[in-house]
């Protein structure tokens, strides 16, 4: 097959992906091989591929394809999350467009409509993953609501309940009044809102005075139950134990001592509303209030309802919370108890989907005893059973698990795993995997099922084992079954649990990663994965966070359409540095598209010069130094790549193969062998060179395949008839015996020699076509041998002709390589005086800008107060001007 003149990614990507999938090449079908397993973080079934997905899934695919090339039984579990809230909202919006509401249907009818939507529209993101090149095991695609996974979810709920680790309790939750459900912290978006800080005075019950409190939510005073002061605050020590009489309600509430009150903040006294504030809830418990006795003044829509003590005036009942706020402030002002109002920017929680202000709300929900489950999870990381990369995240992990709270796992939705709990007429609960079992527990009493569903994080926490056979395969074979050479007898669960690596954004470390560790240890007795890799965010080119409101989001599919999937994948991999966010600039994607084009053109050159597929895994025999050098460089690249991938240093691995392909192979090797392949050259040397070049190109394609799967598969087949695809080829062996130090030293010297001459020519504005004589001074015998042996290459690539004798007097450039100095006469080639003046002027300008930037960076006011992206740009500009001044200075120095 003749390689087309132009590289067109769109012409090859869909064809090769269909070929791989149709031929089952993504499936783990090597039962005797070492298993290697990754589970994909299941994207929402409602979702579309965003740039964060593209990063996350590219990093996983690099590891999976690499493991496959290493001969492992590579399984990449793929599937989607049912996304309770998001999916229910999508279907409700569709109904709304038809003038219908969810409540117009029975629960069963509505759920049937959700399944209809899922079958029709739920495959968008999986189709988009294919466009990225993700080599997932699509034949066994999972869904968190499919029958097998749902069975696992119900079993876990029932087992945890029976073990006393899951229970019903009254606690505060993040309540979304728009969706009328509890939501997780991850679904809460904090925004800065311009608001007020109201200062009230509460009269002491004995009439002896008043105490000042301040609040940003005055309406909640209708449910105040205490005023807290710091026990060390001398101003209030005598008041501890006394009571105040609340304005409006007349409720008597105690003054309690609690360290939550900060003597330095406001008056030092804090109103306590345990039913509507997370901090106050804890203060209330410490003060002796039971959750069941804490006052609640809002309903599910955040409208005022009567408290248990009946003290809220009737004209407040039914008011929206913000209407109630205005009415409370007006009433307190009318009583003369409004001391002052301050303008303040308030951190306000919003539901990320409803955009409603979130209300801390006291309600009955189902909770998991996360504190008990967290202890083994902490030890798993401390002991090294799980390696966290970057290691710096372990501190955050420990801090969160050491202070973990009970986990609210119930949601007030219809779509999701309905909680397997039933109630009799007296409210007694019966927990079982199905209604028949619950009825048996209840002795045949009439039962009503709990209407709530489970938090999607509860089900997705089972993903590493619930997707590969648990609970059906649990206990079928001992783990050592496949290790003893009987791999075919081991269940999928035994072979692929624990998983090898989990790739995750750091933002779900607590919501998903830690909970998988807790559930995996509890139900499987082993960690769910051996390594946890946490990547950063993909940001805009200027470092700002991407958001639709800013209009700076990047569509990965648009980049694929424009530059190809390989270019996007390589960009994300090359920019993925442990512990850092990615600043995505489209120019980088364009640059790596150019890299793909360079590889394409190198393959065209090879094909046009009779270089084809290699016939051997081992490097061919070679006598020419340039061939021995490129073989050694190939082996060194394999070694470096193996280390970088093992250490999950993605940027290092991508840059290693990039530098080898672009510089060593294309810029140097192919240029150096052109004379060897020319017509009339030594046929033996030409044959050797074709064999070596073909072998090296094969190794390049295999090494590059995990990063750029499409172009490598295309070129693999274009360069020769193969009876297997590159996706299942063999990873190169890093045989150090193939490294020839003498050849490496010689060609490295040649590259330095040509590079220094080229730099001198460029820096001094020597016309590209001008040939210059070069006079060697102080060259050793070995250097003179090298000059003679490589004279043709030097003349061709540096455009200089080696001359004997002394250099003529006059202006000249001086190039130093090792011990030798090369004099390049420039009289009549360039205007030496004008060139000196140009360089001096350029140096002065660069140094002036450099020094100005240094002064700005040395100013603490700039570094501390300027936007981070402005400081970073100043640092980059300073480095650029420093390098420019250095390079211009070196050019001037060469003129002597």
From Swiss-Prot:
Motif mapping: 'KMSKS' region: 545-549
Known function: Catalyzes the attachment of valine to tRNA(Val). As ValRS can inadvertently accommodate and process structurally similar amino acids such as threonine, to avoid such errors, it has a 'posttransfer' editing activity that hydrolyzes mischarged Thr-tRNA(Val) in a tRNA-dependent manner.
Protein name: Valine--tRNA ligase
Keywords on record: Aminoacyl-tRNA synthetase, ATP-binding, Coiled coil, Cytoplasm, Ligase, Nucleotide-binding, Protein biosynthesis
Subunit structure: Monomer.
Cell location: Cytoplasm
Regions annotated as coiled coil: 831-857
GO molecular function: aminoacyl-tRNA deacylase activity; ATP binding; valine-tRNA ligase activity
One of the protein's GO biological processes: valyl-tRNA aminoacylation
Domain notes: ValRS has two distinct active sites: one for aminoacylation and one for editing. The misactivated threonine is translocated from the active site to the editing site.
Keyword presence, Cytoplasm: yes
Gene Ontology CC: one annotated term: cytosol
Major localization listed first in the record, in broad terms: cytoplasm
Enzyme Commission code(s) on record: 6.1.1.9
Binding site for ATP: 548
Motif 'HIGH' region: positions: 43-53
Enzyme's top EC category: ligase
Catalysis performed (reactions): tRNA(Val) + L-valine + ATP = L-valyl-tRNA(Val) + AMP + diphosphate
Keyword Plastid appears in the UniProt entry: no
Similarity comment: family membership: Belongs to the class-I aminoacyl-tRNA synthetase family. ValS type 1 subfamily.
CDD domains reported for this sequence: Anticodon_Ia_Val, ValRS_core
NCBIfam families: PRK05729.1, valS
Superkingdom in the source lineage: Bacteria
Short name of any one Pfam family annotated for the protein: Val_tRNA-synt_C
Gene3D superfamilies: HUPs, Isoleucyl-tRNA Synthetase, Domain 1, Valyl-tRNA synthetase, C-terminal domain, Valyl/Leucyl/Isoleucyl-tRNA synthetase, editing domain
